[in-house]
């Protein structure tokens, strides 16, 4: 019984140390939309996600706290009044890939295709 407790304690300690030893790496740039970001930084332990945000013609890429990944908080921190953003939690996931704002367009296209199929099947 004592050996099991010791093993469990050891596994818990290893889990804690392993999770804190590995830091997230994010792209870190503030630039116009047309530029591409090649700089990256290792996030501090309290920053557990990467942020990619676009406000007008400006792009923000940096480490961020997942718990602060809300539009109002991001706008306040970046001093912007309107933006599109995404947060992600794996290394260099905040690359500028042009995907912001395209999901609704894809959803609309799929919806139109489904509606067309429904109407065509009733003719």
UniProtKB/Swiss-Prot annotation:
Organism of derivation: Mus musculus
Superkingdom of origin: Eukaryota
UniProt xrefs under PANTHER family: CD59 GLYCOPROTEIN
Annotated glycosylation sites: 40, 94
Gene that encodes the chain: Cd59a
Complexes and interactors: Interacts with T-cell surface antigen CD2.
Tissue specificity statement from the Swiss-Prot or TrEMBL entry: Expressed in all tissues examined (liver, kidney, spleen, thymus, brain and heart). Low levels in thymus. Also expressed in mononuclear cells, erythrocytes and platelets. Barely detected in neutrophils.
Membrane protein topology class: Lipid-anchor; GPI-anchor
Role noted for this protein: Potent inhibitor of the complement membrane attack complex (MAC) action, which protects self-cells from damage during complement activation. Acts by binding to the beta-haipins of C8 (C8A and C8B) components of the assembling MAC, forming an intermolecular beta-sheet that prevents incorporation of the multiple copies of C9 required for complete formation of the osmolytic pore.
Record flagged with keyword Disulfide bond: yes
Stated name of the protein: CD59A glycoprotein
Chain ranges of the UPAR/Ly6 domain: 24-96
Cysteines paired by S-S bonds: 26-50, 29-37, 43-63, 69-87, 88-93
Keyword list, A-Z: Cell membrane, Disulfide bond, Glycoprotein, GPI-anchor, Lipoprotein, Membrane, Secreted, Signal
Propeptide position ranges: 97-123
Signal peptide positions on this chain: 1-23
GO biological process: negative regulation of activation of membrane attack complex; negative regulation of angiogenesis; negative regulation of complement activation; negative regulation of fibroblast growth factor production; negative regulation of vascular endothelial growth factor receptor signaling pathway; regulation of complement activation; regulation of complement-dependent cytotoxicity
Entry PTM: N- and O-glycosylated.
UniProt subcellular location: Cell membrane; Secreted
GO (cellular component) term, any one: cell surface
UniProt KW Thylakoid keyword: no
């Amino acid at each position: 019984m004592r050996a099991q407790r010791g093993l469990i304690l050891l596994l818990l300690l290893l889990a804690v140390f392993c999770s804190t030893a590995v830091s997230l790496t994010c792209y870190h740039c503030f630039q116009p939309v047309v530029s591409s970001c090649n700089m990256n930084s290792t996030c501090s332990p309290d920053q557990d996600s990467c942020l990619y945000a676009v406000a007008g013609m400006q792009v923000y890429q940096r480490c961020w706290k997942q718990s602060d990944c809300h539009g109002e908080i991001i706008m306040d921190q970046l001093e912007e009044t309107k933006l599109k953003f995404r947060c992600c939690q794996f290394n260099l996931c905040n690359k500028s890939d042009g995907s912001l704002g395209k999901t609704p367009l894809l959803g609309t296209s799929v919806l139109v295709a489904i509606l067309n199929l429904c109407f065509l099947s009733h003719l």
